[in-house]
Swiss-Prot record:
<dbReference type="GO" id="GO:0061844">
    <property type="term" value="P:antimicrobial humoral immune response mediated by antimicrobial peptide"/>
</dbReference>
<dbReference type="GO" id="GO:0048020">
    <property type="term" value="F:CCR chemokine receptor binding"/>
</dbReference>
<dbReference type="InterPro" id="IPR036048">
    <property type="entry name" value="Interleukin_8-like_sf"/>
</dbReference>
<dbReference type="GO" id="GO:0008009">
    <property type="term" value="F:chemokine activity"/>
</dbReference>
<keyword id="KW-0873">Pyrrolidone carboxylic acid</keyword>
<comment type="similarity">
    <text>Belongs to the intercrine beta (chemokine CC) family.</text>
</comment>
<protein>
    <recommendedName>
        <fullName>C-C motif chemokine 8</fullName>
    </recommendedName>
</protein>
<comment type="function">
    <text>Chemotactic factor that attracts monocytes. This protein can bind heparin.</text>
</comment>
<dbReference type="GO" id="GO:0048245">
    <property type="term" value="P:eosinophil chemotaxis"/>
</dbReference>
<dbReference type="GO" id="GO:0030335">
    <property type="term" value="P:positive regulation of cell migration"/>
</dbReference>
<feature type="disulfide bond">
    <location>
        <begin position="34"/>
        <end position="59"/>
    </location>
</feature>
<dbReference type="InterPro" id="IPR000827">
    <property type="entry name" value="Chemokine_CC_CS"/>
</dbReference>
<dbReference type="InterPro" id="IPR001811">
    <property type="entry name" value="Chemokine_IL8-like_dom"/>
</dbReference>
<dbReference type="GO" id="GO:0005615">
    <property type="term" value="C:extracellular space"/>
</dbReference>
<feature type="disulfide bond">
    <location>
        <begin position="35"/>
        <end position="75"/>
    </location>
</feature>
<dbReference type="Pfam" id="PF00048">
    <property type="entry name" value="IL8"/>
</dbReference>
<dbReference type="InterPro" id="IPR039809">
    <property type="entry name" value="Chemokine_b/g/d"/>
</dbReference>
């Protein structure tokens, strides 16, 4: 009787862990980066180096994370015109061949 109770406990534990892994597969192996606050003002383009779009459904809001030349990360609203323009310019800059 003790063996079957232990086996049942082991099976329930395994089943519970399996559903957690299946329900949230990206939380197991990939860390999630979210923005909880957005910058109010415009960041000059000359200070920007790159960007990353945050569209993860587990984050409270969509955002763009700009990496500055000073190696800082700043969250911005992707709906703002200056953010969209900066992303376009950074895309063009990254596609321009360097001599």
């Amino acid at each position: 009787m003790q063996v079957s109770a232990a086996l049942l406990c082991l099976l329930l534990t395994t089943a519970a862990f399996s559903t957690q892994v299946l329900a949230q597969p990206d939380s197991v192996s990939i860390p999630i980066t979210c923005c909880f606050g957005l910058v109010n003002g415009k960041i000059p383009f000359k200070k920007l180096e790159s960007y990353t779009r945050i569209t993860n459904s587990q984050c409270p809001q969509e955002a763009v994370i700009f990496k500055t030349k000073a190696d800082k990360e700043v969250c911005a609203d992707p709906q703002q015109k200056w953010v969209q323009n900066s992303m376009k310019l950074l895309d063009q800059k990254s596609q321009t061949p360097k001599p």
